[in-house]
Amino acid sequence: MGKKSRVKTQKSGTGATASVSPKETLNLTSELLQKCSSPAPGPGKEWEEYVQIRSLVEKIRKKQKGLSVTFDGKREDYFPDLMKWASENGASVEGFEMVNFKEEGFGLRATRDIKAEELFLWVPRKLLMTVESAKNSVLGPLYSQDRILQAMGNITLAFHLLCERADPNSFWQPYIQTLPSEYDTPLYFEEDEVRDLQSTQAIHDVFSQYKNTARQYAYFYKVIQTHPHANKLPLKDAFTYEDYRWAVSSVMTRQNQIPTEDGSRVTLALIPLWDMCNHTNGLITTGYNLEDDRCECVALRDFRAGEQIYIFYGTRSNAEFVIHSGFFFDNNSHDRVKIKLGVSKSDRLYAMKAEVLARAGIPTSSVFALHYTDPPVSAQLLAFLRVFCMTEEELKEHLLGDNALDRIFTLGNSEYPVSWDNEVRLWTFLEDRASLLLKTYKTTIEEDKSFLRNHDLSVRATMAIKLRLGEKEILEKAVKSAAANREHYRKQMQAGAPLPRCEESGTAGARLPLALRDLEAEASVQEALSLTEAVGRAKAVENGLVNGENSIPNGTRSGKENFNQEGSERATEGTKESSSDSTAGARE
């Protein structure tokens, strides 16, 4: 999968001979599980909790040093075996080769001219590692008994990967040997590198991801040591935190949803070869062909011989890319920052505002997004702000007035203001809110730019600083845009300009409100690949496979959510989750 990290080459060796008492580790993991299962810390206490959890994890890592399974040689040494294995099992291997693109990591390079929309890559089901293949493997007996494995396909895939890696005769060895030895996701950050993310919106998701991963490891360490169905697992004598972090990171950056063989539902999968593709802006061009039972990818654009072949991972923000994929994508046209807004229940007009919002399909409290592109405000956010700033008379017009339903349908349309005064108030409010968010950062835009120019930073520190810089630039842009709109509408109001009115259609019931149309993935919610689309051949469809979809075993949901339910794992190409519960493609 494109842009997945390979910070260093694979270590030599076949595993470790070091010995550590299972009881000693069990005591440490029990302490870790207790710490990670405690209630969420209060405001301002998250960093303290993170440091405490990290301290326990580091103690465990120190005791387990040398116990992890590794492969001899470099990752790229195994590429010929991967291509041979893929070819022998029905995958396409003509027209491209695997190459190290330095900063972008390994990717695919065209060896011939490839036309836009040309089918150039397909991978049959038999090559995929899926939840179904996990059930039919040595992991099957434990899967049948463990509710967390049953509920969280992400974790099942991670253990499937670990078990197959430990088996030198595994069918998937040619694939597993080419996976990165480590990643650039925050799970691998040093403490100082995580500190660079403090005050960013992303930091809460970073803390949550680390805590969830530590809790899962502690829980499953005990399961593997004590559960009778775990006796035959090749992990029994050496299940390290390092191994688990690697496995969940591999899954996090690569997992996708595909239809099951009968097409009745979806399952999670790792897709060899295809997951080497790196990301660029564009459209999703991968899907699943049920007729031929294979994943198929068509070219995003024309690629000439010698050029890198890119795919589009989905509409992910850079926070999602950094947290779940381990890279920062410059000029990300889908970058955004979150802004949480809600109507206070103490508002005298709360009931009326809630009713208007309900008719528009918008909650009274939600996480919206401010965007990198123009306009920075979506139709849904604009509709919310208009209702939020309505007077009692304006609310009555939208509830009881003539053509009230038609008014609801135009709430998200910038061409039809509620009133000039309403526009002035909403843009003033947004300007103030974005300005306040900017003040929460400990550094300025200029300071971040200077720091990037004048310091020799690690890859991870650079990503962290670019991320906080990007957040501030989006907020600053929103402030300027809001200020310009405020002044524009103030002049309209002062001039007594006539208010534009939408042509009354009388057919409102047959239309969807503009605010409800799927104009964007608010709060980074990614669309799922529908079964209908999954059945079709690979085309440049909007909901296809995305490199590195993840609904999180190690994402950013609360501990309870992460342990007790399978976070809406979305269709292929980047199952990113709402409000950072996602995981995207990481650097190769």
UniProtKB/Swiss-Prot annotation:
Region (Disordered): 1-25, 546-588
Catalytic activity, EC: 2.1.1.85
MF (Gene Ontology): actin binding; histone H3K36 methyltransferase activity; histone H3K4 methyltransferase activity; protein-L-histidine N-tele-methyltransferase activity; transcription coactivator activity
Processing after translation: Phosphorylated by GSK3B, which is required for recognition by the SCF(FBXW7) complex and subsequent degradation.
CDD domains: SET_SETD3
Family the UniProt entry places it in: Belongs to the class V-like SAM-binding methyltransferase superfamily. SETD3 actin-histidine methyltransferase family.
Subunit structure, as described in the record: Interacts with MYOD1.
The protein's name: Actin-histidine N-methyltransferase
Species assigned in the record: Canis lupus familiaris
Gene that encodes it: SETD3
